[in-house]
Design a protein with these regions (language model features):
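Secretory pathway targeting signatures of secreted, lumenal, and periplasmic proteins
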Residues: 226-278, 320-322
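Phosphate/pyrophosphate-binding loop motifs in nucleotide- or prenyl diphosphate-using proteins
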Residues: 61, 179
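Short, solvent-exposed coil/turn segments at beta-strand boundaries
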Residues: 231-234, 251-254, 308, 331-339
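Signature of long, low-cysteine stretches enriched in small and polar/charged residues
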Residues: 282-333
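Short secondary-structure junctions
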Residues: 65, 77, 235-242, 288-304
Length: 352
């Protein structure tokens, strides 16, 4: 009997040691596919921008349809539903599974879990049934996982509609720099007070949970060039040279833009393509050689931008920064001839 009791105690001790060891630990590898998406959502077309994210969300168990055959991609989310998604991310990351069930009211279990695990604080939201905003979603999702698994891959320092005084600004910038948020335009406009839709939530969810889905971004800033507004990288510098050329340079990307415009009534009614390709080559070569740059190996071809006829010229431009491949577009509108030169010092794939 004593030997049997000893065996039972030894077995119990072994099991008590083995079970915790076999339990899932905090890890991004805990996110695993649990279902197969077979195009069952009739309101999600193959060409819809968020279809890949919706598919991944379904397969990884992050989101379900509003019905077995409907996802409602443009439907709004409530704060409670957004908390459910944040809880699901946290629980799977922490334990390897999602086990939470509805309470009374239905969302109370999820709110309690979020508070207990530091995803939200009591009093963060005045209504859990209100529609969730994009800013609130950023707040929840940035806190669902440890900051260590959301490292910065971008360097976003400014946004058009988010400042240090904007609610949730810290979480918003954190997700931009982690490659989770990209904005609604080239400037990174976020619209923090707009209601978030289910398709947008799917995109954010997949990028938080699956690092390979995160995006590197180069956000632009707007600068004025005469009557025109140009979009240039945030890290780029801009200025006007003594001879009136507008220049944009980015040391980070080893590239630049040179733009100039010449006004002459003689241009009115003309197309730049009245010039031959060789004449265009000669004009550009002489123009650059009269500045601090030198253009060589110029080769021009005729192109069109809608109704505007233009020349596309490739060549090698040498400046005090060194020699680089360049791409030049020259065209006439009204009584102005405009020239825009794109320059890459290291990697000419930027010009493709």
């Amino acid at each position: 009997m004593k030997k049997l009791l000893s065996l039972v105690l030894t077995l119990a001790l072994a099991l008590s040691l083995c079970v915790p060891a076999m339990a899932a630990s905090e890890s991004m590898t805990n996110f695993q596919k649990t279902a197969t998406y077979n195009n069952q959502f009739s309101d999600v077309s193959a060409s819809y921008w968020a279809t890949p994210s919706i598919k991944l969300c379904y397969e990884y168990g992050f989101m379900k349809g509003t019905t077995p055959k409907q996802f409602s991609p443009t439907g709004a989310l409530t704060v409670a539903e957004a908390i459910v998604m944040a809880d699901r991310l946290h629980e799977i990351y922490t334990t390897g599974q999602s086990t939470l069930t509805n309470g009374e009211p239905w969302y109370q279990t999820y709110v309690d879990y979020a508070i207990e695990n530091g995803i939200v604080q009591a009093g963060d939201f005045t209504s859990y049934t209100a529609k969730a905003t994009r800013g609130q979603m950023a707040y929840l999702f940035s806190r669902a996982l440890p900051a260590s698994v959301l490292p910065s891959i971008n360097n976003v320092q400014t946004l058009p509609d988010v400042t240090s005084s904007t609610k949730y600004s810290q979480e918003i910038f954190s997700l931009y720099n982690a490659g989770v948020l990209t904005g609604s335009d080239v400037f990174g406009t976020f619209k923090p007070n707009d209601n978030i839709i289910r398709a947008e939530a799917a995109a954010i969810l997949t990028r938080v949970a699956l690092p390979e889905q995160r995006k590197t971004v180069v956000l632009m800033k707007q600068v004025q060039w005469g009557a025109a507004k140009l979009a240039i990288p945030q890290s780029a510098g801009a200025g006007v040279t003594e001879n009136g050329m507008y220049t944009v340079t980015s040391e980070q990307d080893a590239c630049g833009v040179i733009a100039t415009s010449v006004t002459d009534s003689a241009y009115k009614g003309l197309s730049v393509t009245v010039l031959t390709e060789q004449q265009m080559n000669n004009i550009l070569t002489q123009a650059f050689n009269s500045t601090d740059g030198k253009l060589s190996n110029a080769k021009s071809t005729k192109v069109s931008f809608g109704s505007v006829k233009a020349y596309r010229t490739v060549g090698i431009l040498t400046t005090d920064e060194g020699a680089g491949d360049c791409l030049i577009f020259t065209y006439i509108t009204g009584n102005k001839m405009d020239m825009i030169c794109l320059l890459a010092y290291e990697n000419d794939t930027a010009l493709k």
